[in-house]
């Protein structure tokens, strides 16, 4: 199975750090966020990795080629960030037609993916307990089926999931820039084709300066 790392965003909420450094290259401890997640994938048996890049993408590419010189890591280039959905659509020519693992580059975590299914009809999401910055949650589970409540949901999407490329191949999108959560998954959630599981392991979405500081604090306490 291949894996894709989403790494093309601007990281605006992490300014001024991301003025000259793309968010995936920000460090927790001595490692960049993306370095940690590549090591996570390699540790879990993934050897074919695709990374989409755009904003300051050349810095990400140079960093990865330097840190992982012998790895089979390919890059999907975007002239401007295409969003989570558009980024995947643009990378399908590299990813192929088989189910792949999708992971955000900007999460600090210790999530166990050993018990993930081998394939999915549409998508399989890993959820975590709602953090303070997302108390409304993203989705809920009943017998491993994903559904969305009108008000508060039980889980937050961790940024790790399995994706079946068919959900992109069988749809026509008005723009090449779009969000997978808003423009792709709802249709399949309503059809009962999106499954999920809950993780109780450590997880931080490093999307703001405060949460970057928190990730470093947690890292220092663990090491």
Where are the regions that the model predicts?
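Alpha-helical elements of Rossmann-like donor-binding domains used by nucleotide-donor carbohydrate transfer enzymes
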Residues: 36, 40, 59, 90, ...
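Catalytic-core segments of class I nucleotidyltransferases/pyrophosphorylases
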Residues: 101, 108, 114-118, 130-131, ...
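Short beta-strand-to-loop element that shapes/binds the nucleotide-sugar donor at the catalytic cleft/hinge
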Residues: 55, 124-141
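Conserved N-terminal catalytic core of the sugar/cofactor nucleotidyltransferase
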Residues: 2-5, 31-104, 170, 174-176, ...
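Active-site metal-binding loops of divalent metal-dependent hydrolases
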Residues: 10, 105-107
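N-terminal nucleotide-binding beta1-loop-alpha1 segment
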Residues: 1-19, 33, 193
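Short catalytic helix/loop segments, enriched in acidic residues and glycine
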Residues: 20-35
């Amino acid at each position: 199975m291949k894996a894709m790392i989403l790494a093309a965003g601007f990281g605006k909420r992490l300014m001024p750090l991301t003025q000259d450094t793309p968010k995936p290259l920000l460090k927790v401890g001595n490692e960049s966020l993306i370095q940690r997640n590549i090591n996570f994938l390699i540790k879990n048996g993934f050897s074919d990795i695709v990374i989409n890049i755009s904003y300051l993408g050349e810095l990400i590419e140079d960093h990865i080629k330097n840190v992982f010189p012998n790895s089979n890591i390919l890059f999907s280039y975007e002239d401007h960030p295409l969003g989570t959905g558009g980024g995947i659509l643009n990378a399908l020519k590299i990813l192929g037609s088989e189910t792949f693992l999708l992971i955000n580059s900007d999460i600090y975590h210790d999530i166990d993916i050993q018990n993930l299914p081998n394939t999915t009809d549409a998508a399989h999401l890993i959820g975590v307990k709602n953090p303070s910055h997302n108390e409304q949650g993203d989705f809920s589970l009943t017998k491993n089926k994903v559904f969305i409540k009108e008000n508060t949901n039980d889980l937050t999407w961790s940024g790790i999931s399995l994706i079946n490329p068919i959900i992109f191949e069988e749809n026509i999108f008005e723009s090449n820039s779009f969000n997978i959560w808003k423009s792709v998954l709802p249709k399949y959630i309503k059809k009962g084709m999106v499954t999920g599981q809950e993780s109780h392991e450590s997880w931080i979405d490093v999307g703001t300066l405060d949460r970057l500081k928190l990730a470093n604090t947690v890292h220092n306490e663990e090491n």
